[in-house]
């Protein structure tokens, strides 16, 4: 009787230990629980419009300060694109400019689409 009880107890202990290890494996595999989420949040830049406003207010520019890049230029349509590696800039005839994603277009295709859109054909 004692031998049967010991066998049952040992079986339950092994079952609980195996289940616990399995849950720890899944916890590590899917983000490590709360600690992992906490770490990833610390790496993100907070949404803080006050930071942008302070940086904008402290920027020194005697001409025009571009709001998107904080570049100091002579006139607004000379503002550079925020992401020049992936955007093309198009100066429009009315003194404004737009930045358009290069998005895999062949050379000149983005400019053609901008012109078609300006004419109302796109």
Swiss-Prot record:
Matching CDD domains: LCL2-like (cd23996)
Gene Ontology biological process terms in this record: ERAD pathway
Kindly indicate where the leader peptide sits in this chain: 1-21
Domain of life where this protein originates: Eukaryota
Q: Which UniProt keywords apply?
A: Signal
Name the InterPro entries for this protein: LCL2
Q: Which residues form a coiled coil?
A: none
- State the protein's purpose: Probable component of the endoplasmic reticulum-associated degradation (ERAD) pathway.
The entry assigns this protein to a family as follows: Belongs to the LCL2 family.
Q: What is this protein called?
A: Long chronological lifespan protein 2
Query: What is the species of this protein?
Result: Ajellomyces capsulatus (strain NAm1 / WU24) (Darling's disease fungus)
Taxonomic lineage is: Eukaryota, Fungi, Dikarya, Ascomycota, Pezizomycotina
Q: Which gene encodes it?
A: LCL2
